Amino acid sequence: MKADANDASAERGLATIAWLLISFRRGTATVDEYLGGITKQNVALREAPADLASRFNTHIARATMLAEAMLRAKPRDAEAHYQMAVTVGLQASYIATVEGRIIGAFRAARRAYDESEMVLELDPARKYAGLITGVYRYVVSQMSLPLRMMAYVAGFGGGKERGLQMIEDAAAYRSESQADARFALVLLDNREGRYGEAMRQLAELQRVYPRNRLLWLESGGTALRGGRAADAESQLSAGLRMLAADKRQRMFGEEALWYGKRGAARVTLRRLDDAEMDLRRTIAAADARMWVKGRAYTELGKIADLRRDRAAARANFQRAAARQWIETAYSLQR
């Protein structure tokens, strides 16, 4: 910031930190949160902490002002259009994921889409600019029909396969946004059931960011979804050792997630006693989300069923169902 008072990317970085801290405090910084469909115009979410919301809005406003000034000075410069694209793209992401306003994010998202398209028109070699366009193409393809029609009318392009290819091209291109493209592919490959590809991206991210323990949580979850329980158990056990030694702040409900996922892997591996201990720790966690407890009770039901204890199995499955309904009814807790 002191080195260049006109650096939009520095202000954008500060806004990004505030956004990520909000997700961390809510416990929503994992792939699990984004595997469902996009069917609603708005999603009820708990209000963001006022201090962090203020920090985000202050820095994104400054970043936007600086990016606009750069664009006015250099209207045919690809980098100026790129700075505008990523700035308003971040604003759109915040509106959708923190405020829950899907339609409210359309204006900023459309600007980001148009600006990134302009970057590629001015300089097709800048493959990294395709990350924004690719993500929006994919997102539009996953919307319910009414929302998809609204997106088309607003000027968005669709096409899932084209979108994924653009993101893959951005992930393969060495740039400051390469890691962002890899993180995007982790999510989208999980959504598409391409678990091997997601694991490949996660392995590279683990190499680049060896202190980011959540990458081991995501690797374990991805391996579990892909039917690789032994790999999942190994990744999650390694991550839990990192968690125990890490003095940094934990994500809300984080420990419950770790033990719940490892417990599920151990159920699949028929390590039932070890699995039960993990799952009990998940249920006992004071900050465990309802859906996390629901999944833990489901796995305990499986354990009871494998032990031929039908009464315990039924009771645990009923507890799981009850917690899933509670999570739906009280979505403002998320």
Task: Locate the predicted segments by residue.
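TPR/TPR-like (Sel1-like) alpha-helical repeat modules
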Residues: W19, Y113, E117, G155-G159, ...
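Short coil/linker segments at helix-helix boundaries
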Residues: N6, I17-A78, Y82-R126, G130-R191, ...
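"A position-specific structural signal for the A-helix of alpha-solenoid helical repeats
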Residues: G13, L20, Q83, L90, ...
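Boundary/linker segments of alpha-helical solenoid repeat arrays
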Residues: A8-S9, A78-E79, K127-A129, E176-D180, ...
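Amphipathic alpha-helical segments of tetratricopeptide repeats
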Residues: K2, D114, E121, A171-A172, ...
